[in-house]
Amino acid sequence: MSEKEAVILKVENLSIHYGAIHALKGISFEIKSGEIVTLIGANGAGKTTSLNGIMNVIKKSGGKVFFNNIDITNIETHEIVKLGVALVPEGRHVFPNLTVLENLKLGSYSRKDKEKIKEDLDWVLKLFPRLGERLKQLGGTLSGGEQQMLAVARGLMCRPKLLMLDEPSLGLAPLLVKEVLETIMKIRQEGVTILLIEQNAFGALKIADYGYVLETGKIVLKGYANELLVNDDVRKTYLGVTT
């Protein structure tokens, strides 16, 4: 098996409860190195919970998570980051009273390789040239689209092998949504594997290699993204297409 075909993330029977609510009901999926994989589903389907479970932000009720064949099920979140997994949470979460540059540097807090950090700063500023024009500007004064770019760029500053993005296009104008999705494809071209959560199912499936459909904590459908785009159930439920 080539490096590109190797499974980088494997989730086995992941279950999560919020009190009496069974939010994830034993889901299993995997991502191969170099892929863009998307989880689509309605609000409350379990998409964000899946990411938080992988990162051990919330307690699991059952199941296993493997990253590069390492069992990370019970590893602390900051240790998972050091292994090469980054999560950009929904809602951007930039530090409003820090400059763009300070926000970016926080993304590399766990790294010691100063020369490589400088190289990666140059790299993310090539990906997001608008941020390079605003390095001294406070994060809170950026537009919504610019804050989203900053959140993604900060996630890249830890040089992840796997980047997990939770609703990166949420609340953005259509032109900015297109720009965000194009940037995600560029990031993949740089060798970063991506797990993408999106309510914009059409946009996500257009750029993804493979997709999983979540409903009420269960994976009800999976397949190559181009196949899901023409699936009648997906088209009616998530793409707004009537047949």
Map each language-model feature to its residues.
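Glycine-rich phosphate-binding loops of nucleotide-dependent enzymes
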Residues: 2-243
